[in-house]
């Protein structure tokens, strides 16, 4: 029996395990939010980054990619990889996956999904909601072993766009981060010019 894994964050563009088939599509009743703190990939314990998790949301959908894994050895390798990679995500759900918005039956039933819950007892890295500008400022500054937090956001934005998916939360956040970076560059240019004039 095949195992299916749903990716809605970095798994979309960086899978990290062997698979036999990938299907773009969506799950129902959830939305993607930058509410999970990352202290091991896109941030540090002293300054966490923010990565996506899923939040229950009636009548909303979360787009991503489902990966089919059939060989037993590949299943074991995938699970070993995911249990390390997603170790800060404290819930594992099995949800219906759709590829057609008009379909009443899922394309795949029971895709495995890693979710970081808001339960602080089981997930002490949960950061929760915050104003868009505050989340953007945190993402601009944070970086970890896997690289700058902003790269995670921009990679997600690009990966979704390449699949033809739109996610307002991701787009708005990416635009806010670009705005902050643009302002920072302008300040750097002004400071450099002022220093040059004083030499």
Swiss-Prot record:
Binds 2 Mn(2+) ions per subunit. Its EC number is 4.3.2.7. GO terms for cellular component: cytoplasm; cytosol. One of its GO terms (biological process) is glutathione catabolic process. GO terms for molecular function: gamma-glutamylcyclotransferase activity; glutathione specific gamma-glutamylcyclotransferase activity. The gene is GGCT2;3. Keywords: Cytoplasm, Lyase. Converts GSH to 5-oxoproline and cysteine-glycine (Cys-Gly) dipeptide in vitro and plays a significant role in glutathione (GSH) homeostasis. Has no activity towards gamma-glutamyl-L-cysteine but possesses very low activity towards gamma-glutamyl-L-alanine. This is Gamma-glutamylcyclotransferase 2-3. It is an enzyme of class 4 (lyase). It is found in: Cytoplasm.
């Amino acid at each position: 029996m095949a195992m299916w894994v749903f990716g809605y964050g970095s798994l979309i563009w960086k899978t990290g395990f062997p698979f036999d088939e990938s299907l773009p599509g969506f799950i129902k009743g959830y939305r993607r939010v930058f509410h999970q703190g990352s202290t091991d990939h896109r941030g540090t314990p002293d300054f966490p980054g923010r990565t996506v998790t899923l939040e229950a949301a009636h009548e909303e959908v979360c787009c991503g990619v489902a990966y089919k894994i059939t060989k037993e050895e590949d299943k074991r390798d995938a699970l070993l990889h995911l249990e390390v990679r997603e170790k800060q995500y404290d819930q594992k759900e099995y949800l219906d996956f759709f590829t057609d918005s008009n379909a009443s039956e899922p394309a795949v039933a029971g895709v495995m999904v890693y979710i970081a819950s808001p339960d602080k007892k089981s997930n002490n890295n949960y950061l929760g909601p915050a104003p868009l500008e505050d989340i953007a400022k945190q993402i601009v500054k944070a970086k970890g072993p896997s690289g700058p937090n902003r790269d995670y956001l921009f990679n997600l934005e690009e990966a979704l766009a390449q699949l033809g998916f739109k996610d307002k939360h991701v787009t708005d956040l990416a635009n806010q981060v670009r705005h902050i970076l643009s302002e920072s560059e302008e300040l750097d240019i002004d400071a450099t010019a002022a220093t040059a004039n004083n030499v």
